[in-house]
Amino acid sequence: MFDLGWSELLVIGVVALIVVGPKDLPVLFRNVGRWVGKARGLAREFSRAMNDAADEAGVKDISKGLKAATNPVDAALDGVRKAATDFKTDLDPTKYNPDSETGKLAAERAEQAKKIQAATARVAAERRLREATAELEKAKDAEAALKPGPET
């Protein structure tokens, strides 16, 4: 608050000890402490009153609006998110009329996509099986190398 370091406080304490005397020094420090406490309380109360007045006036809402308006990155990202959501909902095959040509093509595309996903999953599982088999063979070879031969 006053931006005093330890050396400044020490100098103030020594001067107070010389001027006031050791007998009245605790009373002086107690009174100074009370005064500083009251000053802090008044400052806190003033700050709270100013914040309440600003809240009632709608300053926070205006501030949020200004921040949103001046931050073009968030605005651009909101546009991208909205476009991605719209794109995803536009590709939903259940949205089209099943009797229309578009609905038939969408259903056909959805079926093809399911087949591709199933084939991809099968190929990935086969690859993992091959890799696991190769690792199992390596482990068996390593175990065989560790086993001691028959002693004669």
Swiss-Prot record:
* Main subcellular localisation: membrane
Going by the UniProt record, its keywords in alphabetical order are:
Cell inner membrane, Cell membrane, Membrane, Protein transport, Translocation, Transmembrane, Transmembrane helix, Transport
Q: Which is a GO BP term held by this UniProt record?
A: protein transport by the Tat complex
Kindly list the cysteine pairs connected by disulfide bridges.
none
Is Glycosyltransferase one of the keywords UniProt gives this record?
no
What InterPro entries does the record point to? TatA/B/E, TatB
Q: Specify one Pfam family.
A: TatA_B_E
Q: Provide the transmembrane region boundaries.
A: 1-21
What membrane topology does the annotation report for this chain? Single-pass membrane protein
Where in or outside the cell is it found?
Cell inner membrane
Quote the function comment for this protein.
Answer: Part of the twin-arginine translocation (Tat) system that transports large folded proteins containing a characteristic twin-arginine motif in their signal peptide across membranes. Together with TatC, TatB is part of a receptor directly interacting with Tat signal peptides. TatB may form an oligomeric binding site that transiently accommodates folded Tat precursor proteins before their translocation.
Query: Which HAMAP family does the annotation name?
Result: TatB
Q: Which NCBIfam families match?
A: tatB
Q: How does it assemble?
A: The Tat system comprises two distinct complexes: a TatABC complex, containing multiple copies of TatA, TatB and TatC subunits, and a separate TatA complex, containing only TatA subunits. Substrates initially bind to the TatABC complex, which probably triggers association of the separate TatA complex to form the active translocon.
Name by which UniProt lists this protein: Sec-independent protein translocase protein TatB
- Please report the organism this UniProt entry assigns to the protein: Ruegeria pomeroyi (strain ATCC 700808 / DSM 15171 / DSS-3)
Encoding gene (name): tatB
